[in-house]
């Protein structure tokens, strides 16, 4: 596993999240299947993130706290994604959790781009 698998899982997860968001609230089989696939991607994202941290993040001095912070932010992003889908499915307001998802996703991505592992844009 590696950085590319982690990023690919995130990209697929976010794309399928928006597909599931568009389908949520409709009581059809397709919406449930997409939501389950997104949940599977959550597990893959968490597993690859932990693997990246254990394999390389722990060995880079001076960045331990930032990697742990990024893991916490990543889990919060996944939590907001799931809360958004469940609230939409139940017909409740999703504005707050959707804004939370967007804010935490942006912060997590920016922190990830700042850290030594992965792509170096900054």
Curated annotation (Swiss-Prot):
Pfam families: DUF1516 (PF07457). Its main location: membrane. The chain crosses the membrane at residues 5-25, 33-53, 60-80, 93-113. Keywords: Cell membrane, Membrane, Transmembrane, Transmembrane helix. It comes from the Bacteria. It is found in: Cell membrane. GO terms for cellular component: plasma membrane. It is a multi-pass membrane protein. InterPro entries: UPF0344. HAMAP family: UPF0344 (MF_01536). Belongs to the UPF0344 family. This is UPF0344 protein BPUM_1008. It comes from Bacillus pumilus (strain SAFR-032).
